[in-house]
């Protein structure tokens, strides 16, 4: 079978890692084409057999007519390659493929990687959902709550496939004395609400001033977050080191991980921390990814969104009760073994075959 995957770009990120992993898996027994909207090499290693295309000859796009150029180029590439099925990922690529669906006449699976209520948050986007999403032959979502957002017609075409955990992170929990560091990993953007985490840490620091907070990642809020850190006088305790390679080695011995997001799909950073056996705290945010991963007080702690006091209380609990911290860390590591890549990729493969077979019978 010839399978085409289409996404925005293959930079460092959770969705991109999942796409690369899936493309490599599918390429073992299929001809695979990976196409990006924006020009750029893949951050993740791809099998040499995989063909790679970019729809635009630029690395940044903000102009509306870029979409028109992309649609024209997508049409040409698809007609030239004649894939048996197309998988698209993320909002803009999904829109491109849905617009072209009727003229391409290729079975299409679209994947929604985040909270649908945040994606379809304007009148125009809701119209897109109403009139275009029903064109897809299949829809992949990450949680039950995400699936329930859609109408019955779309739900019947849908399947829930969680993210696979990166196998580099599947380790036995660290048994020694942990470093007095609290870690968070994610883009420095409004969705991740690192400002709430900083506020929670400020509360914790008043009682436990020997701990440090390390927030890995880059993004548009870096300067604003640094200003906040400076304003509260914690620039010696809170650091923003940016992106680092082999982060699993950096954070393995840290005392805890905290995810402060206001919404998520299936958060890779939380999955990876739990797989490493790091005691983990997350907001119980829509669309249910953290709740899918964490059984509260059994393998992690769930707290309310945007509640710095509850978050600080959870952080203190892990600091104060080492027996509890070790208990949730061990259970977290066991939970994430259920999401190893081979199992998840097999679910993808079966759904691809199901949609392809249905279309071939028509």
PLM feature segments, named:
Residues 5-21, 25-66, 151, 221:
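N-terminal strand-loop element at the rim of the active site
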Residues 16-21, 95, 180, 184-206, ...:
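A conserved mid-protein helix/loop that constitutes part of the nucleotide-sugar donor-binding site
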Residues 39, 88-94, 112:
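Short His-centered aromatic/hydrophobic patch
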Residues 145, 164:
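Carbohydrate-associated surface elements
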Residues 226, 237, 310, 317, ...:
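A short, well-ordered alpha-helix in the C-terminal region of glycosyltransferases
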Residues 243, 262:
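Aromatic "clamp/platform" in nucleotide-sugar-dependent glycosyltransferases that forms part
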Residues 279-284:
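Short hydrophobic beta-strand element within catalytic cores of glycosyltransferases
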Residues 295-297, 301-308, 317-322:
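Conserved acidic donor-binding segment of nucleotide-sugar-dependent glycosyltransferases
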């Amino acid at each position: 079978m010839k399978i085409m995957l289409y996404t925005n770009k293959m930079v460092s990120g959770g969705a991109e890692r999942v796409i690369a992993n899936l493309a490599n898996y599918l390429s073992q027994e299929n001809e695979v084409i990976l196409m990006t909207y924006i020009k750029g090499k893949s951050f993740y290693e791809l099998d040499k057999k995989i063909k790679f295309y970019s729809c635009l000859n630029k690395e940044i796009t903000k102009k509306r007519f870029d979409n028109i150029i992309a649609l024209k180029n997508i049409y040409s590439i698809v007609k030239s390659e004649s894939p048996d099925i197309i998988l698209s990922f993320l909002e803009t690529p999904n829109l491109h493929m849905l617009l072209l669906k009727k003229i391409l006449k290729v079975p299409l699976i679209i994947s929604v990687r985040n909270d649908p209520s945040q994606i379809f948050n304007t009148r125009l986007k809701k119209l897109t959902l109403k009139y275009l999403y029903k064109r897809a032959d299949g829809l992949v979502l990450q949680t039950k709550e995400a699936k329930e957002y859609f109408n019955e017609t779309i739900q019947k075409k849908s399947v829930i496939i969680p993210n696979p955990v990166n196998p580099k992170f599947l380790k036995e929990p660290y048994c020694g004395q942990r470093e007095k560091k609290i870690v968070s990993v994610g883009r420095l953007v409004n969705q991740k609400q690192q400002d709430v985490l900083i506020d929670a840490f400020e509360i914790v620091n008043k009682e436990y001033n020997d701990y440090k907070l390390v927030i890995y990642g880059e993004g548009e809020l870096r300067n604003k977050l640094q200003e906040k850190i400076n304003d509260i006088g914690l620039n010696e305790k809170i650091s923003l080191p940016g992106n680092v390679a082999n982060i699993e080695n950096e954070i393995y011995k840290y005392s805890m991980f905290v995810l402060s997001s206001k919404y998520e799909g299936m958060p890779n950073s939380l999955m990876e921390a739990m797989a490493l056996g790091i005691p983990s705290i997350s907001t119980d945010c829509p669309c249910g990814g953290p709740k899918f991963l964490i059984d509260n007080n059994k393998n992690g702690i769930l707290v309310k969104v945007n509640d710095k006091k509850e978050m600080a209380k959870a952080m203190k609990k892990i600091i104060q009760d080492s027996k509890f911290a070790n208990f949730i860390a061990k259970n977290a590591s066991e939970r994430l073994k259920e999401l190893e890549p081979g199992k998840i990729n097999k679910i993808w493969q079966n759904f691809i075959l199901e949609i392809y077979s249905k279309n071939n019978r028509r």
